[in-house]
Each structure stands twice: as structure tokens, then as C-alpha cells.
Amino acid sequence: MPEVTRVSESDRLFAQPQQRVADFVFNEDVVRVFPDMIKRSVPGYPTIVENIGVLGAQFARPHSVLYDLGCSLGAVTQSLRRHVRSDGCRVIGVDNSHAMIERCGEYLHAQDAMYQELLPVELIEADILALELQPTSLVAMNFTLQFVAPDQRLGLLRNIRRALLPGGALILSEKLRFADAQEHALLTDLHIAFKRANGYSELEIAQKRSALENVMLPDTFEEHRERLLAAGFSRVSQWFQCLNFASMIALP
């Protein structure tokens, strides 16, 4: 069962020269092109989304809450609803962008109309740093933590760890940076080649990089691992990587 979306507008947000490139925000302009943007910018994204549902089903406990923190348009929420079969589970999707939550709700209504026996879902427009988490068997954060201020990441992960039920898991996907300068340069260049192959111009690539450089701050895998262990998780395993994009599972 595929993800349900509208036909996305083509991402042309950075196609024209901008005298001053503003910081990237998840506003209505981004929402209109987001499915196209993410597909053309993040290698392996469909595989990650689909398998968060598959892997999440292994950790979901009956009659528990499953969180999609930073849910954007609800791709992970839809995947969890398709794959999790545990009795009494429900998904809570959280995002601080009103435009994202509004469009996400439309996509979920469309999914409900197309498929039967999906998990119930609730959408919350909120800052995940201020959210009081219910006891949960699964938390997914798909390219969300990298937009949280670095000095607030550990506190957020501690809150998630406290809310996790025994046998639960956190699935965390992030863009990575690399401590080795040559490895970082190689994978950065290969990612740029991926974007070129998907139709982005040099101008679009450069301007989007400028828009993101102050708001998206990636960590190395080792930094993620050390922070997750400091937050109280017992084990961290990377299950996917494509170029400089990866996903990991952290167990309580």
C-alpha cells in the first residue's frame, strides 16, 4: 500500500537568484513542493519511510501509543498505520508547522478513504520540546532532530527515553556529517551529484545549502550514539545508510 499524497508541485523554490537567501522554514511554500523536494534531495527516503513501518511493527505493543515526532506530511505516520497490526495501538503525529499539520490531515483522510483497518491517528500542532509524552512503545523521528538546537537534543532524547515502555524503541533518521574530512567531502560531493541527477541546478543546490546552513546542524553517527547512551538508551544500531543519510534504532 503506497503512501497517499496529492500530486506534488515541482520544487522550484530556489530556482531564481535571491539577493538574500533567508533561513529555511517549513511554511506553505515548502508544503506545496515537499514530496517532490524530499524525493529529489534525500537518497533512500522511500526505503527509510517504508521500513520504519515494518521495523516499528516489531516493537509496537498492544494498546500503546506510537509517536511520529516532526511528522511533516505524515509519510511515517502512514507507514506505521499500514504495517502495525498490534491491537489497540494509535499513532500521534506532532509537528510545529501549521501548514504541515493541515496538509498532513488531508493526506490521512485520503488514506482512510482508500484503506480499511488502519490505526487511528491524532495530529498535534506543537513544539516537540514542550510536549508531555504519554507512555509509548515506539517513537519515530525522521530527519527531525537535526533541526533541534544542539543544546536541546539531549533533553529531548531523555524525555523520549523516560516515556518508552519496556521492549519499545526509538527509530531516528538523520543526515550525517563525518569526522574524517576526506570522507565528509566525498559523501557531500556524491550527494550533490544525486541532486544534480534529480534535476536540481547548481544555483538551486547552492541557495538551498545557504538556507539550511543555520537551521539544520547534522551530527556524526558517533555523536548520535554517545548522546543516545547518555540519554539512557542501552543500545544503538544503525540499520540503514545511503550516502550521508542514515537511520538507527535505539533500545531502552
From Swiss-Prot:
Gene3D superfamilies: Vaccinia Virus protein VP39
Full protein name: Carboxy-S-adenosyl-L-methionine synthase
Enzyme class, UniProt record, top EC level: transferase
GO biological process annotation, one example: tRNA wobble uridine modification
Pfam families per UniProt: Methyltransf_25
Keywords recorded for this protein, A-Z: S-adenosyl-L-methionine, Transferase
InterPro entries (alphabetical): CmoA, Methyltransf_25, SAM-dependent_MTases_sf
EC id: 2.1.3.-
A GO molecular function held by the record: carboxyl- or carbamoyltransferase activity
Family in the record: Belongs to the class I-like SAM-binding methyltransferase superfamily. Cx-SAM synthase family.
Catalytic reaction list: prephenate + S-adenosyl-L-methionine = carboxy-S-adenosyl-L-methionine + 3-phenylpyruvate + H2O
Gene this chain is encoded by: cmoA
Positions that bind S-adenosyl-L-methionine: Y45, G70, C71, S72, D95, N96, D127, I128, N142, R209
Upper taxonomic lineage: Bacteria, Pseudomonadati, Pseudomonadota, Gammaproteobacteria, Pseudomonadales
Subunit structure: Homodimer.
Function in brief: Catalyzes the conversion of S-adenosyl-L-methionine (SAM) to carboxy-S-adenosyl-L-methionine (Cx-SAM).
Coiled coil: none
